[in-house]
Structure formats: structure tokens, C-alpha cells
Amino acid sequence: MGLINNNSHQRFPMSNTAYIYDAVRTPRSKGKTDGTLHEVKPIDLGAGLFRELQQRNDLDTSYVDDVIMGCVSPVGEQGSDIAKMIVQNAGWDESVAGVQLNRFCASGLEAVNSAAAKVASGWDNLIVAGGIECMSRVPMGSDGGAMAGDAAFAIKSGFVPQGIGADTIATIDGYSREDVDAYALESQKRAANARDNGWFDSAVVPVRDKNGVIILQRDDFIKAESTMQGLGGLRASFEEMGKYGF
């Protein structure tokens, strides 16, 4: 979740510089029903971060021009313009607007990019932007859509799931299973090292229940104990999809 503003009070100048003033996130957990954050609604995850931004920056929220939130599955608890729902849930000023956008896995990044572009253009001065996805409560694919749910469209458009696409690219470019397993292992080691050394503690906001008890304080789904042998024993994630003809 980012707080983005500029150093100009002029409206619609040729060019402003957009600054990331602050950035926070929740700890990450497993996106399944047995994940640590399963009991927490998406709007509560978001509201906790919004309140943290407000408190640590002594922010008068009436100065916030807009809130932009990326969300891949904007349905159910994540539907109905979740950006505005989080604003209201956090108790921010009623004048603060909100918009939700979807660019699949790049939704949160697109939200930040859009906020930066609006600030740089002079359209807005202060925006909160980020992404939200609570996959333990709103699983991937919950929102349906033509690509996965309309066979005629999927065949006509040549739809290929992301995992199959990644496997295909790896094959074309000559990456072996051992190559990508080694990359994954190094990623897990670096994530564990960063967490254990507290490198991102200032940005990670603990998640609390309605009584103020901490549910999750640090990322708990990093596989620090992974080994090449262990990874090598896992089945290919998209093997069955490949058998179906993708």
C-alpha cells in the first residue's frame, strides 16, 4: 500500500515529480482455508493498513484525492469497488474516493503506476494505491470470466494459462527443471534472510483481530527449509493442465 504525492500545489502543470511517501503491507500467509489470515475479511486487512498510514503520518485523510486498488478477483467480499469499501471501513473522510482495477497479476503494480501518472500529470496531489487479494477467502478464478469459463472463446483466442506459458518459455529458452528449482530455492533463502534480519519490519503491519490480539506479525509461509532434493521430488504444478491440451 503506497502513499504517493507531489511537491507542487499547481493544477495541471506540464510535469510534476511523483514521490512514494510511505509504503506498508500486511504479513503474507498461505492463501488457503488453513492459512493464518483466513479468518480476516479483505476489507479488514486493507483497513488496518489505511489506519496505520493515517497514524504514522499524522494524515488528514480529507487531503487524499483518490484511492486506487488492484484486485484480480473483484467478487464477493472483494467486490463492489473494494477500494471505496476499505476507505469507509477505515473510517477515513467521507470525501475520499476509491476505484478498483484489474490487470491480473499486475493489478497492484498497475494501481501504483496509475497513481504516479495522475500525480505527475497534476490531476491529483495525494493518492493511496496498492493491491489486495485474500485468496484464502476468495480463491483464484472466483470471478469466472470468458478466458476460463467460455470454451468457445478460449479456443478462438488461443488462451493459455500462465503456468503453461511459463513452462513453454522455459522449454524454448533452455531452462532445465534444475535451473528453475535452484532459482526458487535461492528466492526462498533470500526471503527468509530478509525476514529474519528484520529488513522490512518497518513496512510490515501486524494483523490483529477485533479484540486487538495479533493474528500474524511476520510472513509465515516462507519455505526456508527447502532443499534441491525436496524441490526435485515435487510434481510439476501444471502437469495435469498440460494433459488437458493447453
Language-model segments: residues:
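Active-site-proximal alpha-helical scaffold in enzymes
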Residues: 101-132, 170-200
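Conserved catalytic cysteine-centered active-site region
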Residues: 71-125, 156-164, 228, 232-246
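Short, Lys/Arg-enriched N-terminal segments with co-localized hydrophobic residues
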Residues: 1-13
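Short glycine/serine/threonine-rich phosphate/pyrophosphate-binding segments
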Residues: 29-30, 79, 109-114, 133-139
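Conserved active-site "lid/cap" helical segment
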Residues: 12-90, 97, 105, 168-177, ...
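Flexible glycine-/small-residue-enriched beta->alpha junction loops
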Residues: 120-173
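Structural alpha/beta core scaffold segments of enzyme domains
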Residues: 3, 60-61, 65, 120-121, ...
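N-terminal extracellular/periplasmic Venus flytrap/periplasmic-binding protein-like
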Residues: 15, 24-27, 38-48, 56-58, ...
